[in-house]
Amino acid sequence: MSLLKERKPKKPHYIPRPPGKPFKYKCFQCPFTCNEKSHLFNHMKYGLCKNSITLVSEQDRVPKCPKSNSLDPKQTNQPDATAKPASSKSVANGLSAFDSKLQHSSAREDIKENLELQARGTHRCLGQKPALHRASPCKSPAPEAALGAQPALEGAARPSAFVPVGEHRLKGPDNAEAPETLALHNPTAKAVSFHTKSAFHTPGYPWKAGSPFLPPEFPHKISSTKGLGAISPYMHPTIPEYPPHFYTEHGLATIYSPYLLAGSSPECDAPLLSVYGTQDPRHFLPHPGPIPKHLAPSPATYDHYRFFQQYPSNLPIPYGFYRPESAFSSYGLRLPPVTGLTRDQSSHLLEEATLVYPASSPSRLNPSDPNRKHVEFESPIPEAKDSSKAGQRDTEGSKMSPRAGSAATGSPGRPSPTDFMQTSQTCEGLYDLSNKAASSALGRLYPPEQSLTAFRPVKKSTECLPAQAAETTAESPVSLNVVNGDPPAPTGSASLVSEAAPSSPDDSSGMGPLNLSKKSEINLAATHEPTYQGSPQAETASFSELQDLPLNLSVKDPCNTQAPRPAFPGRPRAAEPAAAVPQKTGTEGSEDGPSHPETKPGSLDGDGAPPTGPGEEAPDACAVDSSEEQKQTAAVALCQLAAYSPRNIRVGDGDAAAPEPACRQDTPTLSSMESQEAQCDLRPKGQKRTSLRDAGKSQQGAKKAKLQDTARVFTLRRRARVS
């Protein structure tokens, strides 16, 4: 008992008496108090306290009740405590009256019989004794604490005193007005009996497994049902609540609606509503039919529903998803263009919405850009190249400009062909990879128109190169790019800055990537530049410049890559429809280096198809790249070109790069290579980092350079992707 007393503070099984008053053991079940713990034990445990019997058993059944009971018991305990300060009297009265009923005889018998129980009873009594003291000062906390603590201590064998104390207190308030323990006891006992029957029998709360278990141990505890009786209203709502929960969760909107409307109990309804934010999904699933029903039953709930319904309505957007290009620019960036419906709008929307292409956004700012971009989007529809360009923009948004980024990509690592292709392939893979083959054909057919549009505007820069560009265009995409190298030479004089600035003039007016390559000496640079320009910037620039000037798009233009000259000269080639197609192939191959490198190993067609897309892109990319993007890419390209600028090698590289396309069309490649050697120097060196290798290899041999250039284009592709 002393141990239990020590535990008292921890787990108050007792209500402590006021410190000024002697320890009176109080029955937790009832106001009965006695200085003799044995009396309390007998009273509480052995049916001496009918309340304790009923309450404890019921509370065992309804473990949740104690706290609720403790709330009311607090009130009861206070009156009880008030009576209990004279708890000696209360004990005398309670013991006399109640014991006269049950306690004296049963208490003594129980004391004798229940020395075993006295351990528990002792716990209770000890708890009660301090509880009496504690009762007046902190009855409300103590009851709850006692309720919570004693069950933990006694576990299965809860002291009826502990749990029932709260229960009794609940009852106590009913009888609390009677200061005498007897008055409280008798009415409480009666009420407890009644509640026990009502709560214990009526509640039908067998859901609490404790009830059958505890009653056997403490049949007297059944009186705890009194507390349950008070709680039972809640319990019943809880029980009804659960079925509605399940039904509603099952999506029985009708059930749920009635449930919400009728509501088993307002308590449950509010929690259920809050809980049933998930109801929205249920309703959402059946929403086609049930939605009206749901809306009728619970508008508040359907606010969530409406939100979810909107969400599903957004879900349809995946197929309507291309209409909101701006919304789904990353996904549908190319797709809306593919539809060709919102090419202009979609292009702008996608560009704007797709901040993924920061550089492309600046290019969009370019006046020409809208047309270019639209063309670009148009080309993506037919060609994967445009998509690859978009993909590269996505990937190269960091690099500089998505379109100008071809140069930027090239300058970072000559990835422009690679980046363009691989990045584009990544994004492009969604729908553009499929489009690529078709795009090759379509690109040549349809893109030539757009390319022509792009190319012809770009032609401003195209000087002598347009003829060469046309020649090379038909002959070799790289050749075309090489031819493009010459006109870019003046523009390329600005080198990368020239690429940015001329890109703005050339691209803005010509819609083509800037010819930043000042080194016309390296035609191979032009060849590599196509690879570099193959990146979005090169793509864009090269289409514009293909019209204006034959671009040296050779992948092998590390030195000339210095000024990643957009295939601006090559764009003029595109000016010619036939040339435009090959130019697209060549220039795009060079520009869209990723596509081109990818295609290079494959064939001119592979190159050509992607270039066609870029040709269309070119207006977009040129405008975009010509502005900020190309400037930025030019800066990057200049840095790279500075790093990789063996101009002689570049000339060789240009030759190698041209031969690479030349492998497809050797003669045009040679012609363009010659043109490019002058112009290729102007070609951005950064277009192809392979150009350094290619330069050496080109010096070794054009064919060797061609083969290795193709391999390097792929290598560059990988590098560009990495960069």
From Swiss-Prot:
Key words of the record: Activator, Differentiation, Metal-binding, Nucleus, Transcription, Transcription regulation, Zinc, Zinc-finger
GO cellular component assignments: nucleus
Gene Ontology biological-process annotations: cell differentiation; epidermis development; establishment of skin barrier; membrane biogenesis; negative regulation of epithelial to mesenchymal transition; negative regulation of transcription by RNA polymerase II; positive regulation of ceramide biosynthetic process; positive regulation of gene expression
Key word Nucleus present: yes
Primary subcellular site in the record, as a coarse category: nucleus
Binding, Zn(2+): 27, 30, 43, 49
Biased composition (Polar residues): 67-91, 360-369, 470-482, 530-545, 666-678
Record localization: Nucleus
Disease: Seborrhea-like dermatitis with psoriasiform elements: Characterized by a chronic fine diffuse scaly erythematous rash on the face, particularly on the chin, nasolabial folds and eyebrows, around earlobes and over the scalp. The rash exacerbate in the winter, with emotional stress and after strenuous physical activity. Hyperkeratosis of skin over the elbows, knees, palms, soles and metacarpophalangeal joints is evident. There is no arthralgia, arthritis or neurological disorders.
Name under which the protein is recorded: Zinc finger protein 750
The organism's taxonomic lineage, starting at the top: Eukaryota, Metazoa, Chordata, Craniata, Vertebrata
This protein's encoding gene: ZNF750
